[in-house]
């Protein structure tokens, strides 16, 4: 056992990994843009970005940025394969499910539930990771968030939240749910939300 600590012996760096991440991000930015949700259900898990193109004055800058090309996502997220967190996922095509499509559909329902946003004002793009590539999902999501700093990831937290479930409604509404009220489960939350004045 060595009691001398040298931080440099714990730092991992691999230029090939850095290039792999850059390549995946380049591929992501070249994927087609679709309505939210996409027009057809598909199998797979992966990373996605949501773009705003509507007239809500809160997000006018995003609509302007995305007018000619989709370069400014308002939100970036991921959908992982079933069993991913417990390392029980299968790469077998017969066992693939539709996590990515359903996550995008869930976001569309969240937007439709509020009165001041319209799902038709949102577009999305995504990349599907299969096999060993699914290990990249979290890394690429984090890299895209770091690169774009989407508003609903960085400043207005809570868009991607799920219903916390029975017995867990003592928490406060997220910033997103305070700005855009209407999600039924969020209206059940009893905690005191953050003050916008502080």
Language model: regions and residue ranges:
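Boundary/linker segments flanking structured domains
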Residues: 1-74, 78-198
